[in-house]
Amino acid sequence: METLPFINPATGEKFGEAQAATAEDVTRAIKDMRQAFQVWRRRPLKDRIVALRQLQEVIIDSLDEITAVLNQDTGKSRQDGLIEVMMTVDRLHQYYRHAPDWLQRRRVPPGLYVFKSYYKEPHPYGVVAVIGPWNYPFDLTMPIVCSALLAGNTVVLKPSEVTAATGVLVENLIKRVPELSPFVRVLHGGPAVGAAVVQGNPDLVFLTGSTATGRKIAKATAETMTPFIAELGGKDPMIVLENADVAAAAKWGAWGAFYNTGQTCMGIERVYVVEAVYDEFLRQVVAEAEQVRQGYAVDIHNENNMGPLTFERQLQIVQEQLEDALAKGARIVYGGKIDGLFVEPTIIVDVTHDMKLMQEETFGPIMPVMKVKDETEALWLANDSVYGLSASVWSNNMRQAKRVAHRLDVGSVNVNDAISHYPVSLLPFGGVKQSGNARTHGKEEVLQFTQLRSYAIGRPPLPFDLATQMREPNHYKLGAAIMRLSFGVTLQQRLQPIKEALADKELRPEIGRMARLAGVATAVIAFAVALFRAKK
Ligand code: NAD
């Protein structure tokens, strides 16, 4: 049986291992979760929320345990681990408060079809397969699992093999809530286990991962028409305009590029600075990079603010992109040194869009900075990407900042900051173009785990019901007249049936009949309304 080693990227030490799931485990898990779905979907929402709040309580009580595992598993500081937990519980807290509103049945206006009542209601899909990444292995799995459960689904979770210790931790936390654990199954393993989960015919697949993996799953799910939603890679641009607070742009831009060692899907991956402030920005951003303290500490009182890359594959990508850029004429103005998985925060200039560094996702602490003539050139270059996750715009002229923000082909724009839009729990987050089609955060996150169903409720059709009249043969003229009267755009269009009726002998009896029916209908409606009011 395959095992997944837990490796601390800062020290290279192995600190445990997990058993990978077998093909039989995958089949059984999906079968079990399909049965469990019949129980969970019938639980009233308030009971589901009670169970999920117990998990929220367990997470808060287990804070030190979680940050310790994240620290060993990814090399990030305990404080950065705390940020993951904080973002998770903030989201869960908001979702549980708002879910009764988001998930409730809603009446739909009847339009012309007044003799029935109509409503729509979000229903769960069934078994949701959640496939997670390693860069924020807690925050990018736990809230997704909880949202799917909140909506009434059961879940099969396949956490990343790179951070398998966090996957085991997530499994253990869920097991501590007996009310919840029968409705989630965690399957550990690498891409093969993920592929088997997708092939196992779940009712919905949710991936957070690379665009390359998204493409593979899109192909696999197309065969079975399984719905597939994905949060994928990014190449987020930052634009610094002439009216920017350059010191703030340098400080928070550097933070956005180097936070989590650059392994953040909406981290700053490319910077475009207008020529008027380019030299000043470069001077200040280098000064900011000099302040970054690299290192690893187990203690919560650590002095470092940047750890190692999380695993070897990331190092290879960073090295390959740097070599390609340098060979094509780029210049490192700060950093560039590599020691094990520790990569210095690196600022690189003279970059062009034919370099991999400006086109492909890097996911490392590398900040390429490019001088541009003006806002127009910055926008053109920022949009010259297959990705479209987030972007950052810097200007103290809010009209200009908003104008640029609205012309960026991305899912979210942050004006005068970086990354900080992500922790806002009710602000939808997700990509356009090849950055994916999912939305996390808020109502949109929870509702994407539901399918909207519609209901038309009433007694058998009445003779004067429009739906009955339109089904009768020889009612073409009548139907056309009703359409014009009801939906005519101009007064002339609306009045046309009346004019035609007055001129058309054939139509007169029909109009008379409709007028009588309308009279009866009005009386029935008036009686029904009076009865309803009397009952109230
Ligand atoms: P990855 O694509 O390598 O792996 C993601 C998950 O998919 C892992 O669990 C992996 O085992 C699984 N997987 C791989 N191949 C599979 C297959 N054929 N079928 C089913 N499952 C398969 O991504 P990663 O390296 O773990 O994560 C980093 C990537 O995720 C980056 O591209 C990053 O931008 C992206 N990401 C996006 C967001 C977002 O919200 N848009 C957030 C975080 C990370």
Positions of predicted regions on the chain:
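Conserved C-terminal structural/oligomerization subdomain of aldehyde/semialdehyde dehydrogenase
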Residues: 8-17, 343-536
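Short, well-ordered beta-strand elements within core beta-sheets of diverse protein domains
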Residues: 15-21, 36-42, 130, 238-240, ...
